[in-house]
Amino acid sequence: MGRAFEYRRASKEARWGKMSKLFPKLGKSITMAAKEGGPDPDMNPKLRTAIATAKAQNMPKDNIDAAIKRASGKDAADIKIIHYDGKAPHGALLIIECASDNSTRTVANIKSILNKGNGEFLPNGSLTFMFSRKSVFEVEYPKRDLEAVELDLIDYGLTEMEENEFENDKGEIEKTLTIYGDYESFGTLNEGIEKLGLTIKSGNLQFVANNFVEFADEDLKEIEELIEKLEDDDDVQAVYTNIK
């Protein structure tokens, strides 16, 4: 899955680099995690990880604290996580994750963006068997032996581990480790990562394609334009694809 990671990293950073809505989206992730598991990060692994992800993107502490406080408000009570299935041009598959207080508005916006971008809105559940729901963590590259890390984390629910190497925004070569586990293992895997002293750069539950597809550069450009428009929508939290 190395190339898939490189695509995800490059495309995400390109979009986030010019996306003024980054902090609100990170804040909404924090609010939803606090709403689900409580406002105490020590007792809520999803919240701890959402905070770590926000900090890695330099989100100010005041914004993080405000996002946690919003979890107890009426607005947060109305927000629901919704997933929509779709196709991008050239057959790329999309699962679009939204956090919305008005599903009627959200589905109308998603359909409009897909139609204008030569995509297709699919019935809910169409892609269920083409993606797997997984716990996914990206951590700083460990100093200790990777085999030892892998063996230790297997006891906490690790199913796969992936080394990544890429050029960061400073032009330096950076290495990270992506750690995968089953959907149900998020809390225990998070605990294992913390016990090993690994620094979490990001972590959440994701839809990971069972099979990735490689697209030509000219096709990828059109697909990327559609994904960018989807991610610019206020209600969209993430777009998962089968792009290799």
From Swiss-Prot:
One of its GO terms (molecular function) is DNA binding. Keywords: Cytoplasm, DNA-binding, Transcription, Transcription regulation. One of its GO terms (biological process) is regulation of DNA-templated transcription. Signal peptide: none annotated. It is found in: Cytoplasm. Coiled coil: none annotated. GO terms for cellular component: cytosol. Belongs to the TACO1 family. This is Probable transcriptional regulatory protein CHAB381_1426.
